[in-house]
Design a protein with these regions (language model features):
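Juxtamembrane luminal stem/stalk of type II transmembrane Golgi/ER carbohydrate-processing enzymes
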Residues: 1-162, 167, 406-460
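Active-site-proximal specificity loops/subdomain of glycosyltransferases
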Residues: 109, 151, 155-159, 193-266, ...
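A short acidic (Asp/Glu
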Residues: 134, 171-175, 197-201, 273-282, ...
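Conserved beta-strand scaffold positions in the cores of enzyme catalytic domains, especially
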Residues: 186, 220-224, 290-292, 362
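Short internal beta-strands
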Residues: 187-191
Length: 460
């Protein structure tokens, strides 16, 4: 009889994992649903209310998470290679003793009296969804299989964004402004060699030291790659893979106080994820990993919109990066997690079922991929710097390096092999035409937002 009762109890526990809790129950406690489904202890201590004090919901610190104070010029050079996260911070009280949670866009969600917690069902602003109006459209219309299990966190995750840079400084500036208040550390790798193996100046380091990026300097971890991998000149994919491997392993080793559930995202310099999606990953529990972003594709500028989306797996938690991908960014981007030897052990140790998903969809972009988006001089430099892997290597042909030829490619949207593409219509007023910082600084980035060589009908 006792054995029968035990079996019945075990079946009951198993059934819980398939139950969809009502929204009212899910909203009652951000940690209640996660305690049933994920079976993992919180990674940071929770702060108890003071005796006799009012209960409160905690306000996210995603816009107030500096890692280092800006450095004096005398110390800036020696500190480029170090970055330390502060100790754990629990989300703060709402001002004036009230209790409110914030929507992901910063608007208050609910408020209550002095002694009793009160939750109010939200009327969501356009672009936001869910019981607490914190789920952005790029998640609502994604293929995430666990949307009914999403709950706000009391302690935000830290977000690490890793990038290799060559000469994409305008796009890097856009990334810093677009994501600067939600990303906690930008790990940027620069080498004194191009991807082709030729010497190059350390331009990004120079810009860090001369103050060009002072507004974000406290969040930048500079990684210097001082060598070119053997065989990289003959096989460009060796160099391409090595850049991402070195970026990830060397960069992560220099970050202190990491937590297993911190978010790691590795991008190419011409890939910019949407802020709303990154903020969701920071503030919510219940999503699976690894994850990708559906990105709007464009060529030479945002004015040549290409069909479809770019969908590249580019993110996971720090725990998965280390346990499954051996802290190798190229494995994250190019290898299916279930082919990696550590994935089953990671599933068992965390209680998480690994299911790959993508933020956004082919109809709802979750970022931007702007390929060859430079001035003609920038495209020339990309041609001569490119790895010896994408064939034909157009930088080897003198006529393809001619600036007038490059200007004509930008004007027509053509490719180096002489082909022409059919482009969907692109309107600067469309929802995801370009990152907001670009649009707010239209004159400065006009060459990326309007075709500078388009011939106006009727013009002489």
């Amino acid at each position: 009889m006792a054995g029968l009762c035990l079996i019945s109890f075990l079946h009951f526990l198993k059934a819980l994992s398939y139950v969809t809790f009502p929204r009212e129950l899910a909203s009652l406690s951000p940690n209640l649903v996660s305690s049933f489904f994920w079976n993992n202890a919180p990674v940071t201590p929770q702060v108890s209310p003071e005796p006799g004090g009012a209960e409160f919901l905690r306000t996210p610190l995603y816009s107030h998470s500096p890692l280092l104070q800006p450095l004096s010029p005398s110390r800036a050079s020696e500190e480029l290679h170090k970055l330390e996260f502060p100790g754990t911070k629990v989300l703060e009280k709402a001002p004036a003793g009230g209790r409110q949670e914030e929507r992901a866009d910063g608007a208050p969600l609910s408020a209550g009296g002095a002694k009793r917690r009160k939750w109010v069902e939200c009327v969501c602003l356009p672009g936001w969804h869910g019981p607490s109006c914190g789920v952005p459209t790029v998640v609502q219309y994604s293929n995430l299989p666990t949307k009914d299990r999403l709950v706000p966190r009391e302690v935000p995750r830290r977000v690490i964004n890793a990038i290799n840079v060559n000469h994409e400084f305008d796009l890097l500036d856009v990334r810093f402004h677009e994501l600067g208040d939600v990303v906690d550390a930008f790990v940027v790798c620069e080498s004194n060699f191009t991807a082709y193996g030729e010497p190059r100046p350390l331009k990004f380091r120079e810009m860090l030291l001369n103050g060009s990026f002072d507004y974000i300097r406290h969040k930048v971890l500079y990684v210097f790659l001082d060598h070119f991998p053997p065989g990289g000149r003959q096989d460009g994919w060796i160099a391409d893979d090595y850049l991402r491997t070195f970026l990830t392993r060397d960069g992560v080793s220099r970050l202190r106080n990491l937590r297993p559930d911190d978010v790691f995202i590795i991008d190419d310099a011409d890939e910019i994820p949407a802020r709303d999606g990154v903020l969701f990953l920071k503030l919510y529990d219940g999503w699976t990993e690894p994850f990708a972003f559906h990105m709007r594709k464009s060529l030479y500028g945002f004015f040549w919109k290409q069909p479809g989306t770019l969908e590249v797996v580019s993110g996971c938690t720090m725990g998965m990066l280390q346990a499954v991908y051996a802290t190798d960014g190229i494995r994250l981007r190019r290898r299916d997690y279930y082919t990696m030897p550590g994935f089953r052990q990671y599933e068992n140790s965390t209680g998480h079922i690994l299911v790959q998903w993508s933020l956004g969809s082919p109809l709802h972009f979750a970022g931007w991929h702007c390929s060859w988006c430079f001035t003609p001089e920038g495209i020339y430099f990309k041609l001569v710097s490119a790895q010896n892997g994408d064939f034909p290597r157009w930088g080897d042909y003198e006529d393809k390096r001619d600036l007038n030829y490059i200007r004509e490619l930008i004007r027509t949207g053509g490719w180096f092999d002489g082909t022409m593409q059919e482009y969907p219509p692109a309107d600067p007023k469309e929802q995801m035409y370009a990152p907001k910082y670009l649009l707010k600084n239209y004159q400065r980035f006009r060459y990326l937002l309007e075709n500078p060589y388009r011939k106006v009908e009727g013009a002489g």
